[in-house]
A protein has these predicted regions:
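N-terminal single-pass transmembrane signal-anchor helix
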Residues: 9-40, 48
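Weak global preference for isoleucine
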Residues: 16, 24-27, 51, 55, ...
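Short, exposed beta-strand "edge-strand" segments with a Pro/Gly-rich flavor and a Y/T-containing core
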Residues: 8-12, 69-72
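N-terminal secretory signal peptides that target proteins for export/translocation
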Residues: 1-8
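Periplasmic/extracellular, small/polar-rich flexible segments of pilin-like filament-forming proteins
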Residues: 66-174
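A ubiquitous, low-specificity "background" feature that marks scattered single residues
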Residues: 8-9, 23, 53, 66, ...
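Conserved hydrophobic/amphipathic alpha-helical signal-anchor segments
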Residues: 30, 34-80
Length: 174
């Protein structure tokens, strides 16, 4: 009886083949990750544009239905017919009511010029002094006589986002 075992020839991957696969995955990641990050931020900005539109429409509707064109209408979200989720209202301490979400705070100006959406670095704390990556601004049509939608930024990341939003009708102002 023969107790010797014969090994069947097994062939695995060579080190070079494994390195090539890792290199290809690295290159794909380096190309895809910035595009993915940009797409996620553009989606966040689109959500902010939707919320600013809802706030502007609620204020404009309140003005038209009440016939009152006064800063008191702008100063109190209780006057508006609006339902927003994912955040909370608070007093900004300087400029009017503020709606705070995880990524943005929205400021409705008592000077009746419009609604700003400020993209916080990190999680928003509800502090008016939170540093922003970029700012979106939507004017009240009844005040300005036209619809305006602007994006401002002091950071390179924010400038790139502002430029990518021009396809949505946002005017970039450096």
């Amino acid at each position: 009886m023969n107790n010797s075992y014969t090994l069947s020839p097994c062939r695995g991957f060579t080190l070079i083949e494994l390195l090539v696969v890792v290199l290809i995955i690295g290159i794909l990641s380096a190309v895809a990750l910035p595009q993915y990050t940009k797409a996620v931020e553009k989606a966040r900005a689109t959500e902010a544009l939707s919320i600013t539109s809802n706030i502007v429409n609620a204020v404009e509707t309140t003005i038209l239905s009440s016939g009152v064109y006064d800063s008191a209408v702008y100063a109190d979200p209780e006057n508006w017919d609006i339902s927003l989720s994912g955040g909370y209202w608070q007093d900004s301490g300087c400029c009017g009511p503020m709606y705070v979400t995880k990524n943005f705070f929205y400021l409705t100006r008592e000077d009746m010029t419009g609604v700003g959406a400020y993209r916080c670095k990190g999680t928003c704390t509800g502090n008016i002094n939170d540093e922003s990556i970029y700012d979106l601004w939507r004017c009240y049509p009844s005040v300005d006589g036209e619809k305006c939608l602007l994006c401002f930024s002091q950071t390179e990341q924010g400038k790139d986002i502002c430029k990518s939003l021009t396809s949505l009708g946002v005017e970039y102002r450096p």
